[in-house]
């Protein structure tokens, strides 16, 4: 939308659309004529190695099967997706849609989303233990997406994931980039690099576990932010420009560009919820919320080992079915209709709160923590009114601080411009004493300020008192939130003398500092704008954002429809099955130690990289696998886990044997079973000798929930398998 003439598309937009149409035609020709030749060559094993590996079902499927699959998925999908994308562009790019739905936003709104997203990813990265991935054998790595190609390239990526020191250094680099993205330093460079590093970090963790979905949505948001002017607000980049007196976007003025960027972030958050809700309806039907199905999901996640030990859902075994139906309906409604946040303002007050409640319920009843999604809901709320209300209340209760500075001092002007940016609640009023009638000012406030004193020291007037120099800065620190953590330290004994000496030294030498912006005026605006501002009037970029949002929607729909699970792409079909059998299968882990004591074991205490969210579950499932090599992978994992654990504990507490048990609980028939089911399968592994014992179809189903004997003679050879 062009603000001046309200044209839907500019000449540049039309050229861009024609270029995209040309590229689409080239893709259709390439996909129709060239790619089938590569498929036939790869089927014969005569193509590049990575293409040959993709065709893994030669013994089952003919080459015609792969050619038909390519035609159906790629060519037909491309045509339908392109037409859908064009339709969405035509709708979302209309002036009415932009004005009523997308809206406009300030640079501070987009900058706040950047800060919050980087803070979420930084927080989740800090509690990861990426370096411990190197303790796992390479056989446990199963690439589940784009990272699979990096392992085959001669760039040393495979050596990286096998080196503990390199992984820890890479994690520190990722944390540094996320922190720099949070504060907004060199945003245009740091944000894409931070997104790339986190993409690699998360991918490595997934390759050694399973495709879990925590922290995936914040990664999507960060990728989107990398293509937006998110550094225009709440950033060091903005502060630096303001301190130099350079032009920056008006902090208080809204723009369609920031509105579109914010809308794109909202879209990548909302679409996964919609996809998950639709997946439940598509896979399980309208009655996914069947109470038996909901009980199955809750009991299964509660009984399986995780980093949290509570079992709240097991206290609900005698609760009425209506409660579980309400839980299911609430989750289904919250997810399916979450997309309304993209169209209605009132929905942005309802569904994010519902999502927070849903994720808290998942955490309490299923022991799965989606901290990233809980925190990310805050990007839908506009806290400007709250901030202004707090500022108004503080001003009425405590009053404002008047800061008198020397407008001819370059250092003073720069300092005041920066302080104005930090003044979140507008507690500070900056006055150039050279523009004041000082006699009238003294008479009105009952003060005795002299021009000579103001030339030497900045003065802060608060409640009729004058605070000069360092003591003025100390008073400012109490009023500006960003300095609140620093303020108490400024009152420690000795700090006042040191601070006054430092301030005096800088004040005496302030004219020796030469700035290009030496005498720019200071006229602070809302949210810390500088005197000289620019407007983001590049409305032509609106069409590009409409095209980008349309592409995001189409890609999400394609992934959902074709059930694509190829990191970082996912279909979001989570918990979409309908299970009304009333039976839950889960696992228990026991360990025997050098002291002879046997008890429940926590694999979460072994290797930190797989300690969260039951990430080790694919490896212990291999203990009961029937495919060649499954048991060997299980043994290698248990050996690595025992080795890592034994390094942390004292002699006598070291693990000598692990046992994995499979239990099945028929909660419909035996809801009051104190053991929550019967033992149906067990796998024991002796760490030192590598000997394994497998016992199936146990005759004695009265096993208590205590540690069973793990010695080899405890399992009869005739009842199981000895390896």
What are these model-predicted stretches?
Residues 2-443, 451, 512-723:
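Alpha-helical membrane-anchoring segments
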Residues 436-531:
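Thiol/selenol-based redox catalytic cores and closely related redox-interacting motifs
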